[in-house]
Curated annotation (Swiss-Prot):
It catalyses: (1S,2R)-1-C-(indol-3-yl)glycerol 3-phosphate + L-serine = D-glyceraldehyde 3-phosphate + L-tryptophan + H2O. This is Tryptophan synthase beta chain. Its cofactor is pyridoxal 5'-phosphate. Tetramer of two alpha and two beta chains. The gene is trpB. Gene3D superfamilies: 3.40.50.1100. Signal peptide: none annotated. InterPro entries: Trp_synth_b_CS (IPR006653), Trp_synth_beta (IPR006654), Trp_synth_beta/beta-like (IPR023026), TrpB-like_PALP (IPR001926), TrpB-like_PALP_sf (IPR036052). Keywords: Amino-acid biosynthesis, Aromatic amino acid biosynthesis, Lyase, Pyridoxal phosphate, Tryptophan biosynthesis. The keyword Metal-binding does not apply. The beta subunit is responsible for the synthesis of L-tryptophan from indole and L-serine. It is an enzyme of class 4 (lyase).
Amino acid sequence: MGKNQPGYFGEFGGRYAPEILTEALEELESTYQKLKKSKKFKKELEFYLQNYVGRPSPLTYAERLTKQWGGARIWLKREDLNHTGAHKINNAIGQALIAKFMGKKRIIAETGAGQHGLATATVGAMFGMETVVYMGAVDVERQNLNAKKIEMLGAKILPVTAGEATLKEATSEAMRDWALNVSTTHYIVGSAIGPHPFPTIVRDLQSIIGKEARSQFKKRNHNLPHAIVACVGGGSNAIGMFHAFLKDKHVAIYGAEAGGLGPKPGEHSATLTYGKTGFLHGTKTLIIQDEAGQIVPAHSVSAGLDYPGVGPEHAYLSQTKRVDYRMVTDEQALDCFLEVTRVEGIIPALETAHAFYVARDVAKDLGKKKDLIICLSGRGDKDVTEVLRILGERSK
Protein backbone atom coordinates (compact mmCIF):
# COMPACT_ATOMS: atom_id res chain seq x y z
CA MET A 1 0.00 0.00 0.00
CA GLY A 2 1.69 3.22 -1.18
CA LYS A 3 1.45 6.62 0.45
CA ASN A 4 -0.84 8.00 -2.25
CA GLN A 5 -3.30 5.15 -1.89
CA PRO A 6 -6.42 5.19 0.31
CA GLY A 7 -5.62 4.84 3.98
CA TYR A 8 -2.77 7.35 4.05
CA PHE A 9 -2.88 10.95 5.28
CA GLY A 10 0.44 12.29 4.03
CA GLU A 11 3.02 9.94 5.53
CA PHE A 12 0.65 8.74 8.28
CA GLY A 13 -1.87 5.90 8.32
CA GLY A 14 -1.64 2.71 6.29
CA ARG A 15 -2.15 -0.88 7.34
CA TYR A 16 0.49 -2.47 9.57
CA ALA A 17 -1.47 -5.33 11.09
CA PRO A 18 -0.63 -9.01 11.70
CA GLU A 19 -1.00 -11.19 8.60
CA ILE A 20 -3.86 -13.08 10.25
CA LEU A 21 -5.96 -9.87 9.99
CA THR A 22 -5.14 -9.03 6.35
CA GLU A 23 -8.12 -10.90 4.92
CA ALA A 24 -10.54 -9.42 7.47
CA LEU A 25 -9.30 -5.87 6.82
CA GLU A 26 -9.58 -6.36 3.05
CA GLU A 27 -13.10 -7.77 3.45
CA LEU A 28 -14.04 -4.82 5.67
CA GLU A 29 -12.64 -2.33 3.16
CA SER A 30 -14.43 -3.84 0.14
CA THR A 31 -17.72 -4.20 2.08
CA TYR A 32 -17.50 -0.59 3.26
CA GLN A 33 -16.81 0.70 -0.27
CA LYS A 34 -19.96 -1.12 -1.47
CA LEU A 35 -22.10 0.02 1.47
CA LYS A 36 -21.06 3.65 1.02
CA LYS A 37 -22.81 3.54 -2.37
CA SER A 38 -25.78 1.49 -1.13
CA LYS A 39 -29.06 3.39 -0.76
CA LYS A 40 -30.37 0.66 1.55
CA PHE A 41 -27.41 1.03 3.95
CA LYS A 42 -27.61 4.83 3.94
CA LYS A 43 -31.36 4.74 4.57
CA GLU A 44 -31.01 2.27 7.44
CA LEU A 45 -28.17 4.25 9.05
CA GLU A 46 -30.16 7.48 8.75
CA PHE A 47 -33.22 5.79 10.25
CA TYR A 48 -31.33 4.68 13.39
CA LEU A 49 -29.47 7.98 13.78
CA GLN A 50 -32.76 9.89 13.71
CA ASN A 51 -35.08 7.52 15.56
CA TYR A 52 -32.73 5.84 18.02
CA VAL A 53 -29.83 8.25 18.60
CA GLY A 54 -31.98 11.39 18.33
CA ARG A 55 -30.10 13.23 15.57
CA PRO A 56 -29.63 15.95 14.57
CA SER A 57 -28.12 17.02 17.90
CA PRO A 58 -28.84 20.69 18.71
CA LEU A 59 -26.47 23.62 18.28
CA THR A 60 -26.93 25.62 21.49
CA TYR A 61 -25.94 29.26 21.99
CA ALA A 62 -24.19 29.44 25.39
CA GLU A 63 -25.28 32.94 26.42
CA ARG A 64 -24.00 32.94 30.00
CA LEU A 65 -20.65 31.41 29.08
CA THR A 66 -20.26 34.03 26.33
CA LYS A 67 -20.81 36.78 28.93
CA GLN A 68 -18.57 35.11 31.50
CA TRP A 69 -15.64 34.79 29.07
CA GLY A 70 -16.20 38.22 27.54
CA GLY A 71 -15.05 37.33 24.03
CA ALA A 72 -16.49 35.51 21.02
CA ARG A 73 -20.03 34.11 21.01
CA ILE A 74 -19.92 30.48 22.19
CA TRP A 75 -21.95 27.75 20.48
CA LEU A 76 -22.14 24.13 21.65
CA LYS A 77 -22.63 21.16 19.33
CA ARG A 78 -24.58 18.93 21.72
CA GLU A 79 -23.29 15.38 21.28
CA ASP A 80 -23.99 14.96 25.01
CA LEU A 81 -27.71 14.79 24.13
CA ASN A 82 -27.34 11.68 21.95
CA HIS A 83 -28.67 8.38 23.29
CA THR A 84 -25.95 7.00 25.65
CA GLY A 85 -24.64 10.52 26.27
CA ALA A 86 -21.79 10.99 23.80
CA HIS A 87 -20.66 11.00 20.17
CA LYS A 88 -19.56 7.34 20.31
CA ILE A 89 -22.99 5.99 19.31
CA ASN A 90 -22.69 7.55 15.80
CA ASN A 91 -19.82 5.19 15.02
CA ALA A 92 -21.10 2.16 16.95
CA ILE A 93 -24.42 2.07 15.07
CA GLY A 94 -22.71 2.47 11.69
CA GLN A 95 -20.17 -0.28 12.36
CA ALA A 96 -22.80 -2.63 13.83
CA LEU A 97 -24.76 -2.24 10.59
CA ILE A 98 -21.59 -3.00 8.60
CA ALA A 99 -21.08 -6.14 10.77
CA LYS A 100 -24.70 -7.15 10.11
CA PHE A 101 -24.25 -6.77 6.34
CA MET A 102 -21.07 -8.90 6.59
CA GLY A 103 -22.99 -11.63 8.46
CA LYS A 104 -20.95 -11.30 11.67
CA LYS A 105 -22.85 -12.41 14.80
CA ARG A 106 -20.38 -11.18 17.44
CA ILE A 107 -19.03 -7.68 18.06
CA ILE A 108 -16.15 -6.60 20.30
CA ALA A 109 -14.84 -3.21 21.39
CA GLU A 110 -12.17 -1.50 23.44
CA THR A 111 -13.12 1.35 25.76
CA GLY A 112 -11.40 3.93 27.97
CA ALA A 113 -14.00 6.26 29.46
CA GLY A 114 -16.57 3.55 28.92
CA GLN A 115 -18.62 5.60 26.43
CA HIS A 116 -17.62 3.55 23.40
CA GLY A 117 -18.10 0.32 25.37
CA LEU A 118 -21.53 1.58 26.42
CA ALA A 119 -22.43 2.54 22.83
CA THR A 120 -21.28 -0.87 21.54
CA ALA A 121 -23.17 -2.75 24.28
CA THR A 122 -26.25 -0.66 23.41
CA VAL A 123 -26.18 -1.49 19.69
CA GLY A 124 -25.35 -5.11 20.55
CA ALA A 125 -28.55 -5.27 22.62
CA MET A 126 -30.57 -3.53 19.92
CA PHE A 127 -29.37 -5.83 17.10
CA GLY A 128 -29.25 -8.97 19.28
CA MET A 129 -25.51 -9.55 18.83
CA GLU A 130 -23.11 -11.18 21.27
CA THR A 131 -20.97 -8.34 22.65
CA VAL A 132 -17.62 -8.33 24.47
CA VAL A 133 -15.98 -5.13 25.75
CA TYR A 134 -12.31 -4.87 26.75
CA MET A 135 -11.61 -2.21 29.37
CA GLY A 136 -8.45 -1.46 31.35
CA ALA A 137 -8.84 -2.47 35.02
CA VAL A 138 -7.87 1.09 36.08
CA ASP A 139 -10.66 2.49 33.87
CA VAL A 140 -13.20 -0.03 35.21
CA GLU A 141 -12.55 1.53 38.64
CA ARG A 142 -12.66 5.19 37.65
CA GLN A 143 -15.55 4.74 35.19
CA ASN A 144 -17.48 2.24 37.27
CA LEU A 145 -20.95 3.54 36.37
CA ASN A 146 -20.33 2.94 32.65
CA ALA A 147 -18.82 -0.49 33.39
CA LYS A 148 -22.01 -1.45 35.30
CA LYS A 149 -24.23 -0.14 32.49
CA ILE A 150 -22.29 -2.21 29.93
CA GLU A 151 -22.96 -5.38 31.94
CA MET A 152 -26.60 -4.42 32.49
CA LEU A 153 -27.03 -4.22 28.70
CA GLY A 154 -25.99 -7.87 28.45
CA ALA A 155 -22.43 -7.39 27.21
CA LYS A 156 -19.49 -9.20 28.76
CA ILE A 157 -16.86 -6.84 30.17
CA LEU A 158 -13.29 -8.13 30.34
CA PRO A 159 -11.00 -6.03 32.57
CA VAL A 160 -7.42 -5.86 31.26
CA THR A 161 -4.71 -5.89 33.94
CA ALA A 162 -1.58 -5.86 31.73
CA GLY A 163 0.75 -2.82 31.58
CA GLU A 164 -0.91 0.44 32.62
CA ALA A 165 -4.32 -1.30 32.51
CA THR A 166 -5.88 1.54 30.49
CA LEU A 167 -6.98 2.19 26.88
CA LYS A 168 -3.80 1.07 25.07
CA GLU A 169 -3.88 -2.35 26.74
CA ALA A 170 -7.64 -2.71 26.16
CA THR A 171 -7.07 -2.01 22.44
CA SER A 172 -4.26 -4.59 22.25
CA GLU A 173 -6.48 -7.27 23.86
CA ALA A 174 -9.40 -6.48 21.53
CA MET A 175 -7.10 -6.83 18.50
CA ARG A 176 -5.88 -10.19 19.84
CA ASP A 177 -9.48 -11.40 20.24
CA TRP A 178 -10.34 -10.28 16.70
CA ALA A 179 -7.33 -12.14 15.26
CA LEU A 180 -8.51 -15.35 16.97
CA ASN A 181 -12.22 -15.02 16.07
CA VAL A 182 -12.10 -13.19 12.79
CA SER A 183 -14.64 -15.39 10.95
CA THR A 184 -17.50 -14.67 13.40
CA THR A 185 -16.49 -11.32 14.89
CA HIS A 186 -16.34 -7.66 13.89
CA TYR A 187 -14.12 -5.36 15.97
CA ILE A 188 -15.88 -2.00 16.38
CA VAL A 189 -12.85 0.25 16.78
CA GLY A 190 -13.98 3.22 18.86
CA SER A 191 -11.69 5.98 17.66
CA ALA A 192 -10.12 7.16 14.40
CA ILE A 193 -7.15 4.84 15.02
CA GLY A 194 -5.99 1.39 13.90
CA PRO A 195 -5.11 -0.08 10.50
CA HIS A 196 -6.82 1.09 7.31
CA PRO A 197 -9.82 1.23 6.75
CA PHE A 198 -10.72 1.99 10.41
CA PRO A 199 -9.55 5.65 10.61
CA THR A 200 -11.55 6.43 7.44
CA ILE A 201 -14.68 4.49 8.48
CA VAL A 202 -14.76 6.11 11.94
CA ARG A 203 -14.13 9.56 10.46
CA ASP A 204 -16.91 9.12 7.90
CA LEU A 205 -19.41 7.92 10.52
CA GLN A 206 -18.51 10.77 12.92
CA SER A 207 -18.42 13.44 10.20
CA ILE A 208 -22.16 13.92 10.71
CA ILE A 209 -21.19 16.10 13.73
CA GLY A 210 -19.41 18.72 11.62
CA LYS A 211 -21.84 18.49 8.69
CA GLU A 212 -24.77 19.22 11.01
CA ALA A 213 -22.92 21.96 12.94
CA ARG A 214 -21.88 23.70 9.71
CA SER A 215 -25.38 23.69 8.25
CA GLN A 216 -27.10 24.59 11.57
CA PHE A 217 -24.75 27.55 12.11
CA LYS A 218 -25.12 28.73 8.51
CA LYS A 219 -28.91 28.54 8.70
CA ARG A 220 -29.00 30.71 11.84
CA ASN A 221 -26.18 33.15 11.08
CA HIS A 222 -25.87 33.09 7.25
CA ASN A 223 -22.10 32.59 7.52
CA LEU A 224 -19.54 30.23 9.08
CA PRO A 225 -17.97 30.37 12.56
CA HIS A 226 -14.55 31.98 12.99
CA ALA A 227 -13.26 28.98 14.97
CA ILE A 228 -14.14 25.44 16.07
CA VAL A 229 -12.70 23.46 18.99
CA ALA A 230 -12.77 19.78 20.04
CA CYS A 231 -10.85 17.52 22.43
CA VAL A 232 -8.45 14.90 21.05
CA GLY A 233 -7.55 11.49 22.49
CA GLY A 234 -7.64 9.02 19.61
CA GLY A 235 -9.57 11.84 18.02
CA SER A 236 -12.92 10.61 16.67
CA ASN A 237 -15.19 13.42 17.92
CA ALA A 238 -12.58 15.94 16.77
CA ILE A 239 -12.11 14.56 13.25
CA GLY A 240 -15.92 14.23 13.03
CA MET A 241 -16.26 17.92 13.92
CA PHE A 242 -13.28 19.15 11.85
CA HIS A 243 -13.86 17.26 8.60
CA ALA A 244 -16.67 19.45 7.22
CA PHE A 245 -14.63 22.62 7.89
CA LEU A 246 -11.16 21.59 6.62
CA LYS A 247 -11.60 23.30 3.24
CA ASP A 248 -12.95 26.51 4.85
CA LYS A 249 -9.55 28.15 5.21
CA HIS A 250 -10.96 31.16 7.11
CA VAL A 251 -12.28 28.86 9.89
CA ALA A 252 -9.56 28.36 12.51
CA ILE A 253 -9.51 24.83 13.97
CA TYR A 254 -8.23 23.91 17.44
CA GLY A 255 -7.70 20.55 19.14
CA ALA A 256 -7.29 20.15 22.91
CA GLU A 257 -5.12 17.28 24.12
CA ALA A 258 -4.33 16.02 27.60
CA GLY A 259 -1.40 17.82 29.24
CA GLY A 260 -2.01 15.76 32.39
CA LEU A 261 0.22 16.63 35.35
CA GLY A 262 3.05 18.20 33.33
CA PRO A 263 5.62 17.79 30.55
CA LYS A 264 7.61 14.85 31.97
CA PRO A 265 7.26 11.46 30.22
CA GLY A 266 4.48 9.45 31.86
CA GLU A 267 2.69 12.55 33.14
CA HIS A 268 0.60 13.40 30.07
CA SER A 269 -1.10 12.13 26.89
CA ALA A 270 -0.03 15.05 24.67
CA THR A 271 0.83 13.02 21.59
CA LEU A 272 0.63 15.89 19.09
CA THR A 273 2.92 18.05 21.24
CA TYR A 274 5.52 15.47 22.30
CA GLY A 275 4.92 12.48 20.01
CA LYS A 276 7.36 11.02 17.50
CA THR A 277 6.49 9.01 14.39
CA GLY A 278 6.05 5.30 15.05
CA PHE A 279 3.66 2.37 14.74
CA LEU A 280 0.85 1.54 17.17
CA HIS A 281 -2.22 -0.67 16.81
CA GLY A 282 -1.70 -1.19 13.09
CA THR A 283 -1.12 2.38 11.94
CA LYS A 284 1.76 4.81 11.41
CA THR A 285 1.16 7.88 13.54
CA LEU A 286 2.60 10.06 16.30
CA ILE A 287 3.26 8.19 19.54
CA ILE A 288 4.63 9.14 22.95
CA GLN A 289 7.85 7.13 23.09
CA ASP A 290 11.29 7.19 24.69
CA GLU A 291 14.72 7.39 23.01
CA ALA A 292 14.69 3.62 22.42
CA GLY A 293 11.28 3.81 20.71
CA GLN A 294 9.46 2.19 23.64
CA ILE A 295 5.93 3.50 24.26
CA VAL A 296 5.79 5.69 27.37
CA PRO A 297 2.75 5.27 29.67
CA ALA A 298 0.13 7.96 29.09
CA HIS A 299 -1.73 9.87 31.81
CA SER A 300 -4.84 12.03 31.89
CA VAL A 301 -7.49 12.82 34.48
CA SER A 302 -9.96 11.79 31.76
CA ALA A 303 -9.94 8.11 30.80
CA GLY A 304 -11.02 8.90 27.23
CA LEU A 305 -7.88 10.95 26.49
CA ASP A 306 -5.49 8.53 28.20
CA TYR A 307 -3.88 7.11 25.03
CA PRO A 308 -0.21 7.33 23.90
CA GLY A 309 -1.10 7.57 20.18
CA VAL A 310 -3.50 9.59 18.04
CA GLY A 311 -5.48 9.05 14.83
CA PRO A 312 -3.21 9.32 11.76
CA GLU A 313 -5.32 12.07 10.18
CA HIS A 314 -4.71 14.27 13.25
CA ALA A 315 -0.96 13.61 12.95
CA TYR A 316 -1.21 14.84 9.35
CA LEU A 317 -3.33 17.91 10.24
CA SER A 318 -0.81 18.81 12.93
CA GLN A 319 2.15 18.37 10.55
CA THR A 320 0.48 20.54 7.87
CA LYS A 321 -0.53 23.09 10.55
CA ARG A 322 -4.19 23.12 9.41
CA VAL A 323 -5.16 22.45 13.03
CA ASP A 324 -3.63 24.10 16.10
CA TYR A 325 -3.36 21.44 18.84
CA ARG A 326 -2.90 22.71 22.40
CA MET A 327 -2.25 21.00 25.73
CA VAL A 328 -4.57 21.33 28.71
CA THR A 329 -3.53 20.12 32.17
CA ASP A 330 -5.71 18.03 34.51
CA GLU A 331 -6.08 21.07 36.78
CA GLN A 332 -7.19 23.37 33.94
CA ALA A 333 -9.71 20.79 32.69
CA LEU A 334 -11.16 20.32 36.19
CA ASP A 335 -11.59 24.08 36.62
CA CYS A 336 -13.42 24.31 33.28
CA PHE A 337 -15.55 21.26 34.15
CA LEU A 338 -16.83 23.11 37.25
CA GLU A 339 -17.16 26.48 35.49
CA VAL A 340 -19.28 25.15 32.60
CA THR A 341 -21.44 23.11 34.99
CA ARG A 342 -22.22 26.14 37.17
CA VAL A 343 -22.53 28.77 34.45
CA GLU A 344 -24.47 26.83 31.77
CA GLY A 345 -26.17 24.06 33.76
CA ILE A 346 -24.50 21.46 31.55
CA ILE A 347 -22.15 18.88 33.11
CA PRO A 348 -19.57 18.21 30.37
CA ALA A 349 -17.40 15.10 30.17
CA LEU A 350 -13.88 15.61 31.55
CA GLU A 351 -12.64 14.98 28.00
CA THR A 352 -14.78 17.88 26.71
CA ALA A 353 -13.64 20.11 29.59
CA HIS A 354 -10.21 20.15 27.90
CA ALA A 355 -11.86 21.63 24.78
CA PHE A 356 -13.65 24.26 26.88
CA TYR A 357 -10.33 25.41 28.32
CA VAL A 358 -8.80 25.95 24.85
CA ALA A 359 -12.06 27.58 23.70
CA ARG A 360 -11.94 30.07 26.58
CA ASP A 361 -8.49 31.30 25.46
CA VAL A 362 -9.48 31.36 21.78
CA ALA A 363 -12.74 33.23 22.52
CA LYS A 364 -10.85 35.95 24.39
CA ASP A 365 -8.32 36.26 21.54
CA LEU A 366 -11.06 36.44 18.89
CA GLY A 367 -12.97 39.16 20.73
CA LYS A 368 -16.64 40.11 20.50
CA LYS A 369 -18.82 39.77 17.38
CA LYS A 370 -16.95 36.60 16.41
CA ASP A 371 -18.29 33.04 16.74
CA LEU A 372 -16.79 29.82 18.06
CA ILE A 373 -18.31 26.31 18.13
CA ILE A 374 -17.22 23.74 20.72
CA CYS A 375 -17.92 20.07 20.11
CA LEU A 376 -19.52 19.04 23.41
CA SER A 377 -18.51 15.44 22.85
CA GLY A 378 -20.25 13.93 25.88
CA ARG A 379 -21.90 14.49 29.21
CA GLY A 380 -20.06 14.22 32.50
CA ASP A 381 -22.32 12.02 34.65
CA LYS A 382 -19.65 9.32 34.35
CA ASP A 383 -17.04 11.70 35.83
CA VAL A 384 -18.89 13.12 38.84
CA THR A 385 -17.61 10.51 41.35
CA GLU A 386 -14.01 10.91 40.15
CA VAL A 387 -14.20 14.73 40.21
CA LEU A 388 -15.62 14.71 43.75
CA ARG A 389 -12.82 12.35 44.83
CA ILE A 390 -10.16 14.67 43.37
CA LEU A 391 -11.77 17.77 44.89
CA GLY A 392 -11.91 15.96 48.24
CA GLU A 393 -8.17 15.27 48.03
CA ARG A 394 -7.52 18.90 47.03
CA SER A 395 -9.26 20.19 50.15
CA LYS A 396 -7.30 17.96 52.57
